Amino acid sequence: MKLFTQNDRYFGLLDSCTHIFCITCINIWHKTRRETGASDNCPICRTRFRNITMSKFYKLVN
């Protein structure tokens, strides 16, 4: 398994799918969704998630 990183950037990894987001962007998006009462779904595939994990590394999945 090969892990990737980009300088001092942190990523948001969802527990339900393999999509990778900028941690700041996904946290803002998630906060806005929660304030409007929307469910916690991935913005790309709409799979429901429970946790966003902050990570300096990510792996590519084929």
Swiss-Prot record:
Record's superkingdom? Answer: Viruses
**Any GO MF annotation of the entry:** zinc ion binding
Keywords, in A-Z order: Ligase, Metal-binding, Ubl conjugation pathway, Zinc, Zinc-finger
Record-linked InterPro entries: Znf_RING, Znf_RING/FYVE/PHD, Znf_RING_CS
Pfam families from the UniProt entry: zf-RING_2 (PF13639)
* Zn finger spans (RING-type): 1-46
Is Ligase found in the keyword set?
yes
Q: Which residues form the signal peptide?
A: none
The UniProt comment on domains reads: The RING-CH-type zinc finger domain is required for E3 ligase activity.
* Something else known: Encodes the C-terminal region of the E3 ubiquitin ligase p28 protein present in variola virus.
- Identify this protein by name: Zinc finger-containing protein P28b
Whose protein is this, by species? Vaccinia virus (strain Western Reserve) (VACV)
